[in-house]
Amino acid sequence: MPQFLSEDFLLDSEFARRLYHEYAVDQPIFDYHCHLPPEQIAENYRFKNLYDIWLKGDHYKWRAMRTNGVPERLCTGDASDWEKFEAWAATVPHTIGNPLYHWTHLELRRPFGVTGTLLSPSTAKDIWDRCNAMLERDDFTARGIMQQMNVKMVGTTDDPIDDLRHHKTVAQDSSFSIKVLPSWRPDKAFNIELATFNDYMAKLGEVSDTDIRRFSDLQAALTKRLDHFAAHGCKVSDHALDVVMFAEADDATLDSILARRLSGETLSEHEVAQFKTGVLVWLGAEYARRGWVQQYHIGALRNNNLRQFKLLGPDVGFDSINDRPLAQELSRLLSKQNEENLLPKTILYCLNPRDNEVLGTMIGNFQGEGMPGKMQFGSGWWFNDQKDGMQRQMTQLAQLGLLSRFVGMLTDSRSFLSYTRHEYFRRILCQMIGRWVEDGEAPADLPLLGEMVKNISFDNAKNYFAIEL
């Protein structure tokens, strides 16, 4: 019987073990999309305790705790840090079968070195004390953990109005070699249907010194901010397309839509689609001219629990998977961006695994001459960021495209302890390829398949994003 979380965890064949230990394990981490707070990296934040680094802001854990009957006070409320950690420790034994159980113990093992002990009510105090003692050391600050985990690059998620001063601080510090670069997340600039849109336009106008009245004014304001981001090393954009919309409109129509919204009018769904299409097509061309990568995260159904949304706000664990069709609108959007050969490198992620084959085939429609893997089907996202979800995403990518050109894993996390997700991904990748070899579906060519694993683990992303390390 295999031991839980051994050095050969998930590696169920000799070939898989060789792939992982000889080609994957020592590869650095290129974490091209995350939600780490850049100010904590800039100030080399020292975490107060295990709750501060591990549970604070983690909606994955909060969902599990709520499902286990834990009161909200112990999730997001005013309970002490220890009480919240104790409640999490009591929940962990009930998460067997959920990726949280694997993640929890991988994160305790690296970087804390906790092995042979499972988190539970009986071990909570010992683990709390041991890890808190380590968090007082210099190698367990925000930067220290990144260095321990062999991180080479992180891409944070940043709003166009951000001043990016924390990125500048990191970039100017010659003692810290890890690249910390902003990613452009302009959702607030095109979600015209939201009640917050007009206030955001005022803020965008202020930071860009632009009076936004017409669509061309919005373009001018965003261009200034794109230049600002580019000056700070940005090479990546990210868009939450909860619902993919497409409806064309001329400039006069876009001017009218924007003016009426700024005057307080409510727009029709068709007008919202026209405006979003206009912004996305224009931004796509800007990304292409600048050599940026655009990412589309598709299919989240957000803020489902209205009562909790009013109490706690967004992004606290009340989101789920949408089932709106996306193929036709996405095809038209990408085709429109491609009309003048201004479709940038693009990564498509779907939250509904039903859409895996849709994206897996969609990327084949728009690949670029002389650019391997220009269009990417992104790694299993959010609810698919687990063993089965990763296996399905990679299997379908292999069947419908070229797995060997895949840019691999990203944490998409707010936690400095989530880097073990790269380890988890690499183990699953090696397990999958090892099984192909065992079944005679792939040659037992270690150099060939080892190079493929090495590329997916790090080199493909480094080359795709064209960021000098």
Swiss-Prot record:
Q: Which InterPro entries match?
A: Metal_Hydrolase, Uronate_isomerase
Which is a Pfam family this sequence falls into? UxaC
Q: Which UniProt keywords apply?
A: Isomerase
What does the record list as GO biological process?
Answer: D-galacturonate catabolic process; D-glucuronate catabolic process
Name the EC number(s).
5.3.1.12
Point out the signal peptide segment.
none
Swiss-Prot/TrEMBL catalytic activity: D-glucuronate = D-fructuronate; aldehydo-D-galacturonate = keto-D-tagaturonate
- A GO MF label: glucuronate isomerase activity
Q: In which pathway does it act?
A: Carbohydrate metabolism; pentose and glucuronate interconversion
Q: Which family does it belong to?
A: Belongs to the metallo-dependent hydrolases superfamily. Uronate isomerase family.
Q: Which NCBIfam families match?
A: PRK02925.1 (NF002794)
The protein in question is named Uronate isomerase
Annotated source species: Pectobacterium carotovorum subsp. carotovorum (strain PC1)
Query: Which taxonomic lineage does the organism of this UniProt entry have?
Result: Bacteria, Pseudomonadati, Pseudomonadota, Gammaproteobacteria, Enterobacterales
The gene name on file is: uxaC
